[in-house]
Amino acid sequence: MAATIWYEKDADLSVFDGKKVAILGYGSQGHAHALNLRDSGVDVVVGLRPTSKSVEFAKEQGLEVKPVGEAVAEADVVMILLPDQYQAAVYKKDVEPNLKPGAALAFAHGFNIHYGYIKPSEDHPVFMVAPKGPGHIVRREYAAGRGVPVVVAVEQDPDGKTWPLCLAYAKALGALRAGAIKTTFTEETETDLFGEQDVLMGGINHLCDLGFDVLTEAGYQPEIAYFEVFHELKMLVDLANEGGLNKARWSCSDTAQYGDYTSTVITEETKKRMQYQLKRIQDGSFAKEFMDDQAAGAPKFKKLQEEYSHPHLETVGPKLRAMFSWNNAEAKDKDETESFNGKIARTQVQ
């Protein structure tokens, strides 16, 4: 069955006439959503704690900023863009008591709705607009007249108007320039977590670092090992992004292709481990483990962060990256990223 995909012609921004959208959080996604919607003509207010370091930053961008409860109280749509582990507490304390009758709740990830940490009453529309890219790219693409694709879903539709609202939000974000794919909160949550854990982060990160270890332990220069197992990865990903895995393969030598086809690193046992990880995501085991750890002060999370904060390939990575002339040419983007990291590194109401 073909996926349902919507584009700009399929949404109408007049849905927002006379409505106000509250963006809770001003981190990676929060700043992009607030600025893009504002620049699309939507009435936006940013909800932050008065003591948040992001208050002045958001005001510098010309945005209206209010305490979370006040922002929620005057909004017709409330987009919650906080880290998963903080959403339920903020919802209970600041959102639920102040939510206008019939106001819509929106999310960029289905975690808290899917696993039941947030349970809105049935009279509130609930939808999701989840960009398939980090916030600074969502903003940069919008400013360039392009967009980052999104997946969209509706969980509760009490008035029959939630889909038009959801698509209008995606259009205001700039996402319908690229396209919005219909999904569900369940599908988005489970596939997103799986992709992170088994391929994009839990797969590639470990594979690259282990490859670096194998080569350097065998006596090869760390600089050469870095190039072979990490630096070239971006080029292959760019090719795959343009034309799929086949284009990436066809762009490499016959020798490289043969080595790809005959490799024994990824096996049926790997698939079984991935299926086990998916099961833990589906039955809620992973979510419970993560949320329980966070509730206890995140001791395991902090220990793991420290344990993995010094990947072996980064013993030479910074020096090599500083040598690349194109990195100097991209200094503007680097400065933007550093500014983001320094000012709004965490998407939470501080």
From Swiss-Prot:
It catalyses: (2R)-2,3-dihydroxy-3-methylbutanoate + NADP(+) = (2S)-2-acetolactate + NADPH + H(+); (2R,3R)-2,3-dihydroxy-3-methylpentanoate + NADP(+) = (S)-2-ethyl-2-hydroxy-3-oxobutanoate + NADPH + H(+). The active site is at H109. GO terms for cellular component: cytosol. Its EC number is 1.1.1.86. Substrate binds at S253. Binds 2 magnesium ions per subunit. Mg(2+) 2 binds at D192, E228, E232. NADP(+) binds at Y26, G27, S28, Q29, R49, S52, S54, D84, Q85, Y86, Q87, G135. GO terms for biological process: isoleucine biosynthetic process; L-valine biosynthetic process. Pathway: Amino-acid biosynthesis; L-isoleucine biosynthesis; L-isoleucine from 2-oxobutanoate: step 2/4; Amino-acid biosynthesis; L-valine biosynthesis; L-valine from pyruvate: step 2/4. Residues 331-350 are annotated as: Disordered. The keyword Magnesium applies. Its cofactor is Mg(2+). It is an enzyme of class 1 (oxidoreductase). PROSITE patterns: KARI_C, KARI_N. Residues 3-183 form the KARI N-terminal Rossmann domain. Signal peptide: none annotated. Residues 184-327 form the KARI C-terminal knotted domain. Involved in the biosynthesis of branched-chain amino acids (BCAA). Catalyzes an alkyl-migration followed by a ketol-acid reduction of (S)-2-acetolactate (S2AL) to yield (R)-2,3-dihydroxy-isovalerate. In the isomerase reaction, S2AL is rearranged via a Mg-dependent methyl migration to produce 3-hydroxy-3-methyl-2-ketobutyrate (HMKB). In the reductase reaction, this 2-ketoacid undergoes a metal-dependent reduction by NADPH to yield (R)-2,3-dihydroxy-isovalerate. Belongs to the ketol-acid reductoisomerase family. This is Ketol-acid reductoisomerase (NADP(+)) 2. It comes from Bifidobacterium longum (strain NCC 2705). The gene is ilvC2.
